[in-house]
Amino acid sequence: MESYLVDTYQGVPYTAAVQTDLVEKDQLPARLTVWFPLFQTNTPPTVLLEQLKTLTITTLYTASQNGPILKVNASAQGAAMSALPKSFDVSASVALDDYSKLEFDKLTVCELKAVYLTTMKPYGMVSKFVNSAKAVGKKTHDLIALCDFLDLEKGVPVTIPAYIKSVSIKESESATVEAAIGGEADQAITQARIAPYAGLIMIMTMNNPKGIFKKLGAGVQVIVELGAYVQAESISRICRNWSHQGTRYVLKSR
């Protein structure tokens, strides 16, 4: 079984993001990716990861008002597992490659193939921005981060566009604001990491944000959901080999 740790914060308590790769134990097994709700813990990451390897997980494919879901129940051995969410729902789209193999309303035991743990800052220092351009109110522009990575193994550059936030800017001010973004961005971001959670996430650690970035908060780690950005690649390979080269920001008019 594969296990992998992405350590973006060294301290306690910390926020733990746990993702598992599963295979159903039935006659037509589906491969699933299930991520646990974020939780806070004081357990050293290496100890937590070892105890996560004892996970037993069952899933039930059913329906909800928001579409097909998997009802997940989990148990594991070890004192650290008291903080782990034991019962929760995830979107059935996690079963990306084997959607047709899921059997409706059947409780299925799953075999654990891989477990991934990402450590982040404590509650209150982690902000989650879903990769969606939907916003409430009359917004005129979207702030987009263009995160440049280098695949160290293949020597191939990769750019990931990520929606950060929607803002209202007067047309007469748009040129001035856009020109200021470059300097503000130099102060705003210190690092970006790819981590396995909800498929893939990008964790951006904000330093001393100004201007358009100031609402994100200094010292905050921003989570941007990427989903299954690269389905054909090993998630752990991406996490090990994609090195952040820099981040550019653009304002996109709506």
From Swiss-Prot:
<keyword id="KW-0946">Virion</keyword>
<keyword id="KW-1043">Host membrane</keyword>
<keyword id="KW-0472">Membrane</keyword>
<dbReference type="Pfam" id="PF03393">
    <property type="entry name" value="Matrix_Pneumo_N"/>
</dbReference>
<dbReference type="GO" id="GO:0030430">
    <property type="term" value="C:host cell cytoplasm"/>
</dbReference>
<dbReference type="Pfam" id="PF23766">
    <property type="entry name" value="Matrix_Pneumo_C"/>
</dbReference>
<keyword id="KW-1048">Host nucleus</keyword>
<dbReference type="InterPro" id="IPR005056">
    <property type="entry name" value="MATRX_N_pneumovirus"/>
</dbReference>
<comment type="function">
    <text>Has a crucial role in virus assembly and budding. The matrix interacts with the RNP complex and this association serves two functions: facilitate virion assembly and inhibit the viral transcriptase activity. Early in infection, M is localized to the nucleus and may inhibit host cell transcription. Later on, M can associate with lipid rafts supposely by interacting with the cytoskeleton and with the cytoplasmic tail of glycoprotein G. The binding of M to host membrane is stabilized by the surface expression of the viral glycoproteins.</text>
</comment>
<keyword id="KW-1032">Host cell membrane</keyword>
<dbReference type="GO" id="GO:0039660">
    <property type="term" value="F:structural constituent of virion"/>
</dbReference>
<comment type="similarity">
    <text>Belongs to the paramyxoviruses M protein family.</text>
</comment>
<dbReference type="GO" id="GO:0019031">
    <property type="term" value="C:viral envelope"/>
</dbReference>
<comment type="subunit">
    <text>Interacts with glycoprotein G (via N-terminus), and protein N. Interacts with protein M2-1; this interaction mediates the association between proteins M and N.</text>
</comment>
<dbReference type="GO" id="GO:0019068">
    <property type="term" value="P:virion assembly"/>
</dbReference>
<keyword id="KW-1035">Host cytoplasm</keyword>
<dbReference type="InterPro" id="IPR043062">
    <property type="entry name" value="Pneu_matrix_N"/>
</dbReference>
<protein>
    <recommendedName>
        <fullName>Matrix protein</fullName>
    </recommendedName>
</protein>
<dbReference type="InterPro" id="IPR055461">
    <property type="entry name" value="Matrix_Pneumo_C"/>
</dbReference>
<dbReference type="GO" id="GO:0042025">
    <property type="term" value="C:host cell nucleus"/>
</dbReference>
<dbReference type="GO" id="GO:0020002">
    <property type="term" value="C:host cell plasma membrane"/>
</dbReference>
<dbReference type="GO" id="GO:0016020">
    <property type="term" value="C:membrane"/>
</dbReference>
<keyword id="KW-0945">Host-virus interaction</keyword>
<keyword id="KW-0468">Viral matrix protein</keyword>
